A protein has these predicted regions:
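Bacterial N-terminal signal peptides
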Residues: 4-14
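Extracellular/periplasmic carbohydrate-active domains that bind, remodel
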Residues: 17-422
Length: 422
């Protein structure tokens, strides 16, 4: 395989670390939490966190037996947040409970569950973190209908680790965040496993997991059923002034993605993204399968990506690699633009052992005239779709690739592309 060495390096680099067991237990009820679903337990939960964090070895903050209504809480180093099975940490519906703050270099709101410059953090227990975001979704829809652009940070995110180290989420359900649900931001050594991430399929910007300028990340055995990207690897915002750090050394494996926009790299990629492995992924009814997306105002080096052992059922577009986001394919003639700091460069990408049935479109692979997609390899790929695959401004190798289209050609290659078939 072309990128065998890469796969080994990524898998080793992203292996979870083990930290010392915490020594103190802080039950939030002992600090005054009611867990009745109507009393705001924010202060009691935060006091339990702060008390455990002050202990020499940190501790376990326990929530069990009820629905704990809360505004934003802040985790501290060496804390395990244990939300027991059958227990819900529910976000306050009152927008005033979420302080405005600088979030991701811009104006925003404090996340529902957050941590900043902390390490050795675990969220586990089998319970639910519910962002209760419907009122925020409704407001966002009204703004859109009114023609208001709105900010990327105009709603609080769900669970955010900001400049943290050694983070684990295991055995949880995370759902209904106002926007982006789990976000490691400039965070190193992250494991998210055996977790469900859920939201109404029509909810705006409810990405399941967004590793943002983060490194050594494992996402495994996750079920995502949301209203936006099931996973979106990001680095840097639109028109970022820089500098931006890349997202790299990321493994996504043994996951199932239902509603949502698929497994995405981008679109915000001003810091780049490298060394990403996605394997044994099942897509059912997602808008897209594999999606690598950017454009001239948010790109950088995006390379050494491996997608293997992929199954898709009724996915609208199986493979979408485009440097024209939000468009999939340019309209009419495209002129080259000067190469700048935010020009996207997609290269060294392999898609192997992919089977897709019931797609509307097999795919698109298209780069910019000044930055074509280079060294993209499709191997052992079988796609059945209503329409075929288009390739332009790209250098591609197709090795045992079959695209069966009901309408038109299976694969259409533009004169701007170089395709080698094997």
């Amino acid at each position: 395989m072309r990128f065998v060495a890469l796969v080994g390096v990524v898998a080793l680099a992203a292996a979870p670390r083990v930290w010392a067991a915490s020594a103190k237990t802080c039950d939030v009820r002992a600090f005054g939490a009611k867990g009745d679903g109507t009393t705001k337990d924010t202060a009691a939960i935060q006091k339990a966190i702060d008390t455990c964090a002050a202990h020499k070895n940190g501790g376990v903050v326990k929530l069990s037996g009820g629905t704990f209504l809360s505004g934003p809480i802040v985790l501290k180093s060496n804390i395990t947040l244990n939300i027991a099975e059958g227990t819900t940490l529910l976000g306050s519906p009152d927008h005033a409970d979420y302080p405005k703050k600088t979030e991701f270099r811009g104006p925003g709101y404090q996340a529902f569950v957050g941590a900043v410059n902390a390490e050795n953090l675990t969220i586990t227990g089998g319970g639910v973190i519910d962002g209760n975001g419907k009122s925020w979704w409704d407001e966002a829809r009204h703004q859109k209908d009114a023609g208001l652009l709105g900010s990327e940070n105009s709603r609080p995110r769900g669970v955010v680790f900001d400049h943290c180290k050694h983070v684990r989420i295991e055995g949880m359900t995370v759902q209904n965040a106002a926007m982006w649900q789990i976000v490691p931001y400039y965070t190193d050594d992250v494991v998210i496993r055996d977790t469900k991430v859920l939201a109404d399929p029509h909810s705006p910007n409810t990405d399941a997991i967004d590793p943002f300028s983060s490194t050594n990340v494992v996402i495994e055995r996750v079920l995502a059923d949301v209203g936006d990207d099931d996973v979106a690897v990001k680095s840097g915002m639109v028109n970022s002034p820089g500098p931006d750090a890349p997202s790299k050394n990321i493994v996504i494996r043994d996951c199932t993605f239902l509603h949502g926009h698929g497994l995405s790299i981008g679109s915000e990629l001003a810091g780049g993204a490298q060394n990403i492995l996605a394997e044994r992924i099942t897509f059912k009814g997602t808008d897209n399968g594999i999606r690598i997306k950017s454009n001239r105002d948010r790109g950088a080096d995006v390379s050494h990506l491996v997608f293997k052992d992929i199954t898709m059922e009724d996915v609208k577009t199986a493979v979408l690699v485009s440097e024209y986001y939000p468009k999939a394919y340019p309209e009419g003639e495209v002129s080259a633009a000067p190469i700048g700091r935010l020009t996207p460069f997609f290269h060294d990408i392999e898609i192997e052992n992919l089977k897709a049935t019931g797609s509307k479109q097999a795919g698109v692979i298209v780069g910019l005239p000044e930055a074509p997609v280079k060294t993209i390899v499709l191997k052992n790929v079988d796609i059945q779709a209503q329409t075929g695959m288009k390739i332009a401004y790209a250098q591609a190798t197709l090795d045992h690739v079959t695209v069966t289209a009901v309408e038109g050609e299976g694969i259409t290659v533009s004169p701007t592309a170089t395709v080698t078939k094997q």
